[in-house]
Amino acid sequence: MKTLTFISLMTTSVACLGSCTNPAASDAQQPWIVDRFDDIKVIRYEVPGFERLPLEQKELIYYLAEAAKCGRDILFDQNCAANLPIRRTLETLYLNYKGDRTSDEWKALEKYLKKVWFANGIHHHYSNDKFRPEFSESFFREAAASVGMDRFPADFDFLCKVIFDPAIYPTRLNQAAGADMLWTSASNYYSNVRQHEAEQFYAAMAAADAGDPCPVSYGLNSQLVKEEKTGRLYERTWKVGGMYSPAIERIVYWLEKARDVAAEPQKQTLAALIDYYRTGDLKQFDRYNILWLQDTVSNVDFVNGFIETYGDPLGYKASWEANVNFVDSAACRRTRIISENAQWFEDHSPVDPAYKKKVVKGVSAKVITVAMLGGDCYPATPIGINLPNADWIRKEHGSKSVTIDNITYAYDRAAHGNGFEEEFMLRPEDRERIDKYGKIGDDLHTDLHECLGHGSGQLAPGVKGDELKSYGSTLEETRADLFGLYYLGDPKLVELGLVPSFDVAKAQYASYILNGMMTQLARIEPGKNVEESHMRNRKLIAE
């Protein structure tokens, strides 16, 4: 699971690592917000501490970072089958158009391309609605003709229909009650499959393994396809030699280089991930996850694979993502205290004892500096991560939580002095409290959300965790947020030295309610539903 903030983020390459020792030193020299379009703010982030790492760790980060960049096209295709040809068509136009680049139509096309880049496709990354082009179809066709139609796909006419006809692929993820969520969603996790067919397919898999105490995450790394003529259902597995093989082969190439320079136990973890990518075997994925979460000593760490299921309305299929990071040792004090006291928090949570863990195992948490992001972590970036997602692994082996400090710092700097608080917070004492404690409140809530929220509790016997379908992700994020919000106001945090007073909780409560009830809705067109799981979660709690 991951935590997303209410400010979208596009990451940029770090041009000068030498200036990254102290982020505050560069605040006055360069803007944190480098571009704006529609509801998007493009924010620069820095990677402090990279230059102080040993050479072998820098080399490891480089190889892992290259692997993180190789899965971009996977995510585009997962989000919608038309995404890649549309993106490539737009990029060809952008690079080769010789006409007037100052015209309103061209500027509208440029903005549309930026939105496609940012959202990894033609649908908004939060609302899931298809983008409406502000340039005309006639201009688009004339621009393409001026470049030369031989440069564009043979199905150019169909791509025009996808871009300009609002009835084609109208939403990436439809979770409306009563709708066939697969048939009406543009995402590419299922091909020619109805919702009831997919549910029956995976229910049969689960029933066949009903006695397995360590069930795999059925369907996690595959597209489910229905043959037109025979009606047969089968999976196209995402692996070397399977679907997305060219991209996965490049990922494996760089992971093998990383494995060769990594030290144990990380060398073994990388080997397990490579085996999984080669075989597509979900048992191998579980083995990799256990090795990964048990490694609490490596300074450099990573996430790479098909991880989160937010994009699948049924909660089976995972989008591809990557994250390369290293430990921010100075900021790890609070996460160390939280993880060391995980049993106390579990025991004192306001939850039915039947759903509490008797013994909390393997809870680890740290603050990290992210060095590279890819796939579904880019460019709208999480600020916290808690993995793995498999319930039986979390129960038997624990979980690993991280808070991404250089990203939260960039958010804070970009928001500082923008006039928002003065406009929407009427009481001076609220503004003063949030200015003083807002950053620590945000960071601590993320720590509590990831380490204790997602890491807490256990399912009832016989419950697999996918029964809630489209509601599952939202309610899990709600559970984790409520856990964090509840403990922010507990005197235990003062006792542990994590907060100076209850004012930290007051600051977080005020900003959370404001965000859930109003701020985040700036992304949603009037009359549209809130679809993204984290946004739904905040709205549910705040209202």
Summary of predicted features, one role per range:
Residues P54, A263-E264, S473-D490:
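An active-site-proximal "capping" alpha-helix that borders the catalytic cofactor pocket
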